[in-house]
């Protein structure tokens, strides 16, 4: 008997966008669009008849906005939701509110050129729906108690990293922490960073997220945390009490000058179908920081970061993978564990301790 298809409900007030998304999803063998609604009011009528596995939701609609609808869904019957947002500052801020309210993924809707969207973003949409269908939504609403303190060929990070020029340098007192995450990571990072005191090692973080969204994400985390959390800029120095978020649409690598660590924010091809890529970050940390670093891989779909975490371990770094029970999607940590890349497997509520204590 064939596996059951992932049933999807689309909610978007644009008839053209609905048509494009339906065409993409129904052309995918393991996905079926069970309905499409122009706004949340019509969506609720459809939900009264049939409940989908995944909801793809616009956040800016008439009659009832997507955030209000999302909160209603999560309070009544938690369901994986993929946010389909415009690539604007307003769209980014609203989408981050949606992630905080329980959405699991963000995709950007076409602004111009639907043909290009069909070519460039079809795989992104399909991957987001599959990730949502595999997510553990009950972990999205969890919060830790306050602490006592485009489809392209799947390139590896070799396409970005400079050629090897020697072993990682060890004669420095600075310690850095590299974190990589994807689906469910916005909530997980909030839980970890808000548990940290002002005095802690410098951090570099890759969260898979569209361009223009990471600035709003960093600003939000900065307002919630005791530490400083900016979006990274090229040549920023990694300092204690600072967590640099890789910009969407760019790769971020760690480099070193003397006893200090810096980031390089660069263009480049998709790596493991992502930009920024966790592997690009982790493998650069392995090269330039070695035993002075800790690598942490958290909730997310796919295998981005698994190889890089193994390289960090082999270079002398301490390494951590989030455990299955606390992940929204146990994909990236699972692949790292398969490679024997993780020295420790930890629940989300303990990961901040791995940052504070090697």
Curated annotation (Swiss-Prot):
One of its GO terms (molecular function) is protein-glutamate methylesterase activity. One of its GO terms (cellular component) is cytoplasm. Residues 170-358 form the CheB-type methylesterase domain. Phosphorylated by CheA. Phosphorylation of the N-terminal regulatory domain activates the methylesterase activity. Keywords: Chemotaxis, Cytoplasm, Hydrolase, Phosphoprotein. CDD domains: CheB_Rec, REC_CheB-like. It is found in: Cytoplasm. PROSITE patterns: CHEB, RESPONSE_REGULATORY. InterPro entries: CheB-like (IPR008248), CheB_C (IPR035909), CheY-like_superfamily (IPR011006), Sig_transdc_resp-reg_Me-estase (IPR000673), Sig_transdc_resp-reg_receiver (IPR001789). The modification 4-aspartylphosphate is found at residue 58. Residues 7-124 form the Response regulatory domain. It catalyses: [protein]-L-glutamate 5-O-methyl ester + H2O = L-glutamyl-[protein] + methanol + H(+); L-glutaminyl-[protein] + H2O = L-glutamyl-[protein] + NH4(+). The active site is at residues 182, 208, 304. GO terms for biological process: chemotaxis. Its EC number is 3.1.1.61, 3.5.1.44. Contains a C-terminal catalytic domain, and an N-terminal region which modulates catalytic activity. This is Protein-glutamate methylesterase/protein-glutamine glutaminase 1. It comes from Pseudomonas savastanoi pv. phaseolicola (strain 1448A / Race 6).
């Amino acid at each position: 008997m064939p596996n059951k298809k992932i049933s999807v409900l689309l909610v978007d007030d644009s008839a053209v966008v609905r048509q494009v998304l339906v065409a993409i999803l129904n052309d995918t063998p393991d996905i079926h669009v069970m309905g499409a609604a122009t706004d949340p009011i019509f969506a609720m009528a459809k939900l009264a008849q049939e409940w989908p596995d995944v909801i793809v939701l616009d956040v800016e609609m008439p009659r009832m906005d997507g955030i209000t609808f999302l909160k209603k869904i999560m309070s009544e019957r938690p369901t994986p939701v993929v946010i389909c947002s415009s690539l604007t500052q307003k769209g980014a801020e609203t989408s981050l509110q949606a992630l905080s309210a329980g959405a699991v993924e963000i995709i950007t809707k076409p602004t111009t050129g639907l043909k290009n969207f069909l070519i460039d973003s079809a795989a992104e949409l399909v991957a987001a729906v599959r990730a949502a269908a595999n997510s553990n939504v009950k972990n999205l609403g969890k919060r830790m108690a306050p602490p006592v303190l485009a489809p392209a060929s799947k390139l590896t990070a070799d396409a970005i990293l400079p050629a090897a020029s020697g072993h990682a340098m060890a004669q420095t007192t600075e310690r850095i922490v590299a974190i990589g995450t994807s689906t469910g990571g916005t909530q997980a990072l909030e839980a970890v960073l808000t548990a940290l005191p002002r005095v802690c090692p410098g951090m570099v973080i890759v969260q898979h997220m569209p361009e223009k969204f990471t600035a709003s994400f960093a600003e939000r985390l900065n307002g919630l945390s005791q530490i400083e959390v900016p979006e990274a800029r090229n040549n920023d120095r990694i300092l204690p009490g600072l967590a640099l978020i890789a910009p969407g649409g760019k790769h971020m690598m760690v480099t070193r000058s003397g006893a200090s660590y810096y980031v390089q924010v660069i263009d480049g091809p998709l790596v493991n179908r992502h930009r920024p890529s966790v592997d690009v970050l982790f493998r650069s940390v392995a090269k330039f920081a070695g035993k002075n670093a800790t690598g942490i891989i958290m909730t997310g779909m796919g295998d981005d970061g698994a190889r890089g975490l193994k390289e960090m371990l082999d270079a002398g770094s301490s390494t951590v993978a989030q455990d299955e029970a606390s992940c929204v999607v146990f994909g990236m940590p699972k692949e790292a564990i398969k490679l024997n890349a993780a020295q420790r497997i930890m629940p989300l509520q303990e990961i901040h301790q791995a940052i504070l204590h090697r």
